[in-house]
């Protein structure tokens, strides 16, 4: 990945984290995930980013497409998957879920954000997509046959 792409990823993840911190500052912990999601959408729109909410992800199983096998909470600028949680602590399954979404979307980075903490900075995990994307399971490749990993 080019340095410019890494910088763009840092800018995008920075905007998402800033939005999350603002939402958490205003609302605090204790609400349902749906409330934080709605407020994150409002906040991210003010940060001038493209967002897809509850994006359906298809899965190919034995040559059969399951159109809405999964739903991400947010995909930001086509390159960052954001999963919101309201849990006492992250579990391994939360990271596994995000890694699956990264694999299926081809996005290079994801953020787990747990709003059930006193300070959101303690409830954020950045997860990198280090897995290869099986053919037919994610976004189509770019013009050179490589998986799409850049922003935008």
Language model segments and positions:
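Hot-dog-fold acyl-thioester-processing enzymes
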Residues: 29-36
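A short acidic/basic microdomain associated with nuclease active sites
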Residues: 45-62
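Interdomain/boundary linker segments immediately adjacent to catalytic/signaling cores
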Residues: 1-26
